[in-house]
C-alpha cells in the first residue's frame, strides 16, 4: 500500500464517488444498451478503486474479476445475442470513436513503456517459506481462502453448481430461440 495523506485520500474518495454517480446515471439514462453496459463496467472499476482506498486488496481484485470480468462481459454477450441487424450498421467513424482509438493507443504505449522500464529484480520484504508457515493466518486473503476451503466449502460448491445450471439454462434458451427463428 502506498502511504497517502488524509487529504489526498479524501480527494480520491470524492472523485471516485462522483465518477460512480455519473456512471450510474449514464447506465440508467442512456438509450443504447451497449453504452449502459460499458458504463456499468466503469462503475464496477470505480468501486474496485474504492476498495483499494480502504486497503481491501482482495475485495478490489474480486470486484474486477467477478463483476467487470464476468458479469459485465455476460451483459455484453447477452446484448450481442439479442441485438437486431438494424443495430449493426457500417457507418463512418465518429469523432468519439477516433478519440477513443487514440486514447487506447496512447494508454497501450504508456503501459508498454512502463512494463519495459520497470526494474523487476527488486524484491521488497519477501519472506521465506518458513517465515510464511510460522505466521498465523492474519491477512485478509489467507483468512478468506481458509474459510472458503474449510467451513464454507459445501455452500461454495453449491453456488458453483447453481451457476452451472444457470449457464446451461441460458444456452438452452438461446439455442431454442435460434431454432424457432
From Swiss-Prot:
One Pfam family from the record: Oxidored_q3
GO cellular component, as recorded: chloroplast thylakoid membrane
Major subcellular site: plastid
Subcellular location, record wording: Plastid, Chloroplast thylakoid membrane
Keywords: Chloroplast, Membrane, NAD, NADP, Plastid, Plastoquinone, Quinone, Thylakoid, Translocase, Transmembrane, Transmembrane helix, Transport
Keyword Chloroplast: yes
Thylakoid in keyword set: yes
InterPro entries: NADH_UbQ/plastoQ_OxRdtase_su6, Nuo/plastoQ_OxRdtase_6_NuoJ
Molecular function GO terms recorded: NADH dehydrogenase (ubiquinone) activity; quinone binding
Top-level EC class: translocase
Membrane topology, as annotated: Multi-pass membrane protein
EC number, UniProt record: 7.1.1.-
Transmembrane segment boundaries: 10-30, 33-53, 62-82, 98-118, 153-173
Catalyzed reaction equations: a plastoquinone + NADH + (n+1) H(+)(in) = a plastoquinol + NAD(+) + n H(+)(out); a plastoquinone + NADPH + (n+1) H(+)(in) = a plastoquinol + NADP(+) + n H(+)(out)
Entries under Gene3D superfamilies matching the protein: NADH-ubiquinone/plastoquinone oxidoreductase chain 6, subunit NuoJ
Primary role: NDH shuttles electrons from NAD(P)H:plastoquinone, via FMN and iron-sulfur (Fe-S) centers, to quinones in the photosynthetic chain and possibly in a chloroplast respiratory chain. The immediate electron acceptor for the enzyme in this species is believed to be plastoquinone. Couples the redox reaction to proton translocation, and thus conserves the redox energy in a proton gradient.
Subunit structure: NDH is composed of at least 16 different subunits, 5 of which are encoded in the nucleus.
Family as reported in the entry's similarity comment: Belongs to the complex I subunit 6 family.
NCBIfam families: PRK06638.1-3
Protein name (record): NAD(P)H-quinone oxidoreductase subunit 6, chloroplastic
Amino acid at each position: 500500500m502506498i502511504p497517502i495523506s488524509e487529504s489526498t485520500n479524501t480527494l480520491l474518495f470524492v472523485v471516485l464517488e462522483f465518477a460512480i454517480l455519473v456512471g450510474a446515471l449514464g447506465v440508467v439514462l442512456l438509450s443504447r444498451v451497449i453504452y449502459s453496459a460499458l458504463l456499468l463496467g466503469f462503475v464496477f472499476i470505480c468501486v474496485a478503486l474504492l476498495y483499494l482506498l480502504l486497503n481491501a486488496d482482495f475485495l478490489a481484485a474480486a470486484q474486477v474479476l467477478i463483476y467487470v470480468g464476468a458479469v459485465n462481459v455476460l451483459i455484453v454477450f447477452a446484448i450481442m445475442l439479442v441485438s437486431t441487424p438494424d443495430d449493426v450498421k457500417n457507418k463512418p467513424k465518429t469523432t468519439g470513436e477516433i478519440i477513443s482509438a487514440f486514447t487506447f493507443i496512447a494508454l497501450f504505449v504508456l503501459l508498454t513503456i512502463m512494463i519495459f522500464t520497470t526494474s523487476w529484480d527488486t524484491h521488497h520484504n519477501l519472506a521465506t517459506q518458513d517465515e510464511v508457515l510460522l505466521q498465523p493466518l492474519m491477512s485478509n486473503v489467507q483468512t478468506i481462502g481458509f474459510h472458503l476451503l474449510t467451513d464454507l466449502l459445501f455452500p461454495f460448491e453449491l453456488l458453483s453448481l447453481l451457476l452451472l445450471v444457470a449457464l446451461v439454462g441460458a444456452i438452452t434458451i438461446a439455442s431454442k430461440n435460434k431454432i424457432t427463428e
